[in-house]
Amino acid sequence: MGQKINPLGFRLGTTQSHHSLWFAKPKNYCEGLQEDQKIRNFIKNYIKKNIRISSGVEGIARIEIQKRIDLIQVIIYIGFPKLLLENRPRRIEELQMNVQKELNCVNRKINIAITRITNPYGHPNILAEFIAGQLKNRVSFRKAMKKAIELTEQADTKGIQVQIAGRLDGKEIARAEWIREGRVPLQTIGAKIDYCSYTVRTIYGVLGIKIWIFVDEKK
């Protein structure tokens, strides 16, 4: 059997960059990682609770964290910032205060910035959320996959592969189904491929969604 490496880790330093930028002593390293995870989870939960989203898509592509001695800079790359920024200054301040309270950090300031991304459906995380929303609403998995591919084609990408695994359409035996459109060169390190794996709970059990999007090739 072929062993499949994570496409993001495989390309770190060439076409992919780290989402956390900071240094720590080896003994404090695990604390830093846990803190990052806490920040990311808190922001995602906050957005889920405070924004009424009809499509079920929160629209977070990624959250970057940069740390200095006295400052934690968090950049949220979001596809639909209007939902979050309807009364912008108050909401961002509220989020900053809540994160600071959650982390219980006295001598470090937290600064949260929001960056809008063009072509939100060209990002696998947002696309996976869209598919998850469709599956929760009992839309057929094939229909959800095809709709996702249509959305990606509008975002001007070179190729996409979508895989859904689990009890598809409530069948008793779990299986994996996938669909590919265009080129997805997973073995080419110079190819910029965005990847996401996402878990969704449905009434039939847990389904796993994996998405590979071929964005561009490094010349």
Swiss-Prot record:
An MF annotation (GO) of this entry: rRNA binding
Name the principal localization, coarsely classed. plastid
Q: Which domain of life is it from?
A: Eukaryota
Q: Which SUPFAM superfamilies match?
A: Prokaryotic type KH domain (KH-domain type II), Ribosomal protein S3 C-terminal domain
Against CDD domains, the record matches this protein to:
KH-II_30S_S3 (cd02412)
The alphabetized UniProt keywords are: Chloroplast, Plastid, Ribonucleoprotein, Ribosomal protein, RNA-binding, rRNA-binding
- Gene Ontology process terms (BP): translation
Subcellular location(s): the record lists: Plastid, Chloroplast
* InterPro entries associated with the record: KH_dom-like_a/b, KH_dom_type_2, KH_sf_prok-type, Ribosomal_S3_C_sf, Ribosomal_uS3_bac-typ, Ribosomal_uS3_C, Ribosomal_uS3_CS
Q: Which GO terms describe its cellular component?
A: chloroplast; ribonucleoprotein complex; ribosome
The record ties this protein, via Pfam families, to: Ribosomal_S3_C
Q: NCBIfam families, from UniProt?
A: rpsC_bact (TIGR01009)
**Whom does it interact with, and what assembly results?**
Part of the 30S ribosomal subunit.
Q: Which family does it belong to?
A: Belongs to the universal ribosomal protein uS3 family.
The protein's name in its UniProt record: Small ribosomal subunit protein uS3c
Q: Which organism is it from?
A: Citrus sinensis
- The gene name reads rps3
